[in-house]
């Protein structure tokens, strides 16, 4: 998969099933975290056309923006703040069907309508999060959660 993804035109789950082995092969041969995060963000954006795909990395007491695909984003997020900070604090995946209904949502873009945030764990500790935003309401479900959690195990 060095330069090209091979993804069919099936449903969401079929696309994840085709993407996962390609991503695993890509990140398992590269030791640089930033390179891997950048390629994962690009692959997810290319495959699914999400509005925004990116990573935040834990640096001391806040999440700091890492590689991403999409419009300019919030640079720093405190523990427990917004969807990303809450997923970090709780150590679990959060699916938000309507970001306007999430208490304390941080609006990096008014075009973001729904969101999923998946923690990246290393030895049981959250070291970052994968954040994906859609410009449509209710874009994410347990299928996304299951496959994105698996992708995050490749990174952690």
Regions found by a protein language model. Give the residues of each.
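A short, aliphatic-rich beta-strand micro-motif
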Residues: 114-121
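Sensory-domain boundary capping and coupling elements
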Residues: 121-134
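Intrinsically disordered, low-complexity terminal regulatory regions
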Residues: 1-67
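Regulatory sensory and allosteric helical modules in signal-transduction proteins
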Residues: 58-108
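Juxtadomain coupling helices with adjacent low-complexity linkers
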Residues: 2, 20, 24, 134-156
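Short hydrophobic/aromatic beta-strand element in the GNAT-like acyltransferase core
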Residues: 52, 117, 129
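Short loop/turn motifs at secondary-structure junctions and domain boundaries
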Residues: 47, 107-112
């Amino acid at each position: 998969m060095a330069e090209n993804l091979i993804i069919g035109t099936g449903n969401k789950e079929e696309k994840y099933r085709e993407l996962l082995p390609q991503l695993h092969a890509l990140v398992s041969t590269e030791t640089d975290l930033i390179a891997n995060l950048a390629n994962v963000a690009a692959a997810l954006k290319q495959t699914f056309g999400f509005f925004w795909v990116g990573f935040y990395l834990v640096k001391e007491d806040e999440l700091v923006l890492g590689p991403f695909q999409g419009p300019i984003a919030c640079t720093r997020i405190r523990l427990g703040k917004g969807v990303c900070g809450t997923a970090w604090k709780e150590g679990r995946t959060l699916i938000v069907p309507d970001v306007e209904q999430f208490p304390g949502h941080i609006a990096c873009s008014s075009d973001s309508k729904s969101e999923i945030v998946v923690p990246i764990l290393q030895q049981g500790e959250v070291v970052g999060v994968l954040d994906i935003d859609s410009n449509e309401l209710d874009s994410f479900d347990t299928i996304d959660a299951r496959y994105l959690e698996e992708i995050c195990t490749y990174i952690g």
